[in-house]
Amino acid sequence: MNDSEFHRLADALWLTIEERLDNWDGDSDIDCEINGGVLTLSFENGSKIIINRQEPLHQVWLATKQGGYHFDLKDDEWVCDRSGETFWDLLEQAATQQAGEKVSFR
């Protein structure tokens, strides 16, 4: 994958997250902000989830209260380089815990 392909895929990931949050109908408020390629989800309790792109490594990084995760693209899916879990699974787990209610991005 070259840099432009990586940015296209990361942009698509960011857009999907934004669209899902725009349609969010849960009780808790989740704010989404993008600044310089970093996507920040802010929760009512003051906690945050930070998602950023690591262009030199062609990875997406996810920082949550539970820890940090690095994702590589494998077969059109962002997969954690340590656990093998998908980006969406780990994001939903963290967002659900930090929001205090079930959050789905799919």
Swiss-Prot record:
Q: Which GO BP terms, alphabetically?
A: iron-sulfur cluster assembly
SUPFAM superfamilies linked: Frataxin/Nqo15-like
Q: What molecular functions are annotated in GO for this chain?
A: ferric iron binding; ferrous iron binding
Q: Does the keyword Metal-binding apply?
A: yes
Q: Which InterPro entries match?
A: CyaY, Frataxin/CyaY, Frataxin/CyaY_sf, Frataxin_CS
Does this entry carry the keyword Iron? Answer: yes
This protein's GO CC annotations: cytosol
Q: Where is the signal peptide?
A: none
Q: What SMART domains does UniProt report for this protein, alphabetically?
A: Frataxin_Cyay
> What's a Pfam family in this record?
Frataxin_Cyay
Q: Which UniProt keywords apply?
A: Iron, Metal-binding
Source organism, top-level taxon: Bacteria
Purpose: Involved in iron-sulfur (Fe-S) cluster assembly. May act as a regulator of Fe-S biogenesis.
* Protein family membership: Belongs to the frataxin family.
Query: What name does the UniProt record give this protein?
Result: Iron-sulfur cluster assembly protein CyaY
What's the source species for this entry? Salmonella newport (strain SL254)
Q: Which gene encodes it?
A: cyaY
